[in-house]
């Protein structure tokens, strides 16, 4: 089941959970989508600012598997 997150802090909390398996980063021309897979839900965060997206990518937990799509 997908869920959308609007706050960056909420996304980072979800990414640091124990059941978070992987993060997919999908880059589009107008936005960047971060999708974190947890045991029950797939949480999605949409960011339109490219600089914020790069900062968020750097602040992801190191043990998490990160996959970039496009």
From Swiss-Prot:
Belongs to the eukaryotic ribosomal protein eL38 family. Keywords: Ribonucleoprotein, Ribosomal protein. The keyword Ubl conjugation does not apply. The keyword Ribosomal protein applies. InterPro entries: Ribosomal_eL38, Ribosomal_eL38_sf. GO terms for biological process: protein-RNA complex assembly; translation. One of its GO terms (molecular function) is structural constituent of ribosome. One of its GO terms (cellular component) is cytosolic large ribosomal subunit. Disulfide bonds: none annotated. This is Large ribosomal subunit protein eL38. It comes from the Eukaryota. The gene is RpL38. It comes from Julodis onopordi (Jewel beetle).
